[in-house]
Structure formats: C-alpha cells, structure tokens
Swiss-Prot record:
Purpose: Golgi membrane protein involved in vesicular trafficking.
Protein name as annotated: Golgi apparatus membrane protein TVP23
Gene source species: Debaryomyces hansenii (strain ATCC 36239 / CBS 767 / BCRC 21394 / JCM 1990 / NBRC 0083 / IGC 2968)
Polar residues bias locations: 15-32
Membrane association type: Multi-pass membrane protein
Amino acid sequence: MNSAYTAIESDVPEQAQQPSAQSNATSAGANVSPSEWTWSQKLKESSHPIALLFYIFFRVSPLFIYLFGTLLIGIITKKNKFILHFIIIVLLVSGDFWNLKNIAGRLLVGLRWWNEVSVIKSTNGEFENVWVFETVDPNRYINPIDSKVFWTLLYVQPAAWVVLGFLALLKFEFLYLLLIIISISLSLTNAMAFTKCDKFGKANHLATDIFSRATGNLFSRLNPFST
C-alpha cells in the first residue's frame, strides 16, 4: 500500500488565522487561565465552533445511543426496539466517519485523506490501494482548542468501543458485538489515516524547510555580491 501527499491551501484569510492576544484576554478574562475556562468560553475561542460541535456530537452520540438508546426508544415505541436501536447506531457511526474524514479533519486540524485504487502498469490489470494525504500550509494558524478536542476524541472513541465490545462478548450479545466491530473498524481507520497524514505532513514540511535553508546558504556563498 502506497501513500501520496499534497498540500491544502488555507481556506482562512491570513488576518483571521491567528486571534490577537487582546481578544483572547477579553473573552476569557484577564485573571483566568485557559485551563480554567468553561465549555462555553472554550467554544467561543474555537476557530470553527459549528464544526467542533458537530464533531463532538458525532463522536459521542453513537456511544450514548448504544448505552441508553433502548430506554429512549422504549419511551416512543415498544415494537422492534432492537432493530431501531441497531439502525440508529449504524447511521450515527456512518455519519461520524464521513464528517470526520471530509469536514472535521480539514477544518479543525487542516488534514484530509482518502483512498484511491490505481492500476499497476508493470502487471496485467492488477490494482493497488494508494493512501492520499493532504495537509494545510504550515503557516496557517491551528487553534489549540480545536486540535486538542480533535486528537483526544479521535483516540478515545475507538478505545471506548473496545471496552463495550469486551462487555458485549461477556454478555454473549453477538449481534451488538458485530455492530461494535463495525464501529471499531471505521473509527480505527480514521485514527490510523489521520495519524499517518499528520506524520507525513510534518516530515514533508521539515524536509522542505531543510532543503530551502540549504539552497539558500549555498546561493549566498556563491553570490559574489554577498557580504
């Protein structure tokens, strides 16, 4: 399996990329550290509050519905509770996968990935999977609140599904175990892909920076007019 890498142009104007210290101090209070902010204050400091809210919703709601969905559905109807419960969780897990892969990753941390199938030229019609990674310009401001929430929930959710899967196995709930396996596979796919995308982006930016510095020093030494 191969990997490709490209850069994303910033979709945030330069003037709006990095909030001023004065606005941060005003909204959070002069004597309150960021660690003591309330959730509403942290949400106000987010660069993409709507995207952050949807990200939290899709990450948490499948787990919440798995734990309490039967009770909530039982209030509405007594028929086919398991089928409705199963379908709702599948829809939420699918929505979480799509939102994380296509929207939340790009807006919150400037990362995006997808998988392509290409034909190997040296073989007779054989195919290979290629992971394509995109990352934003390193000069773009990444909000620390958005980044912290993104990476925390990216790894916490699959860990929670693993715990629930172990409990389902102990209870011999094999249909729910099948649902959990699907959820874990989708969640781990995103976690692995974004981790690789982040590493590829950092390595590419580091290599570009080293190359630009090396060529800059070389040209400055060869320049007869340099002092």
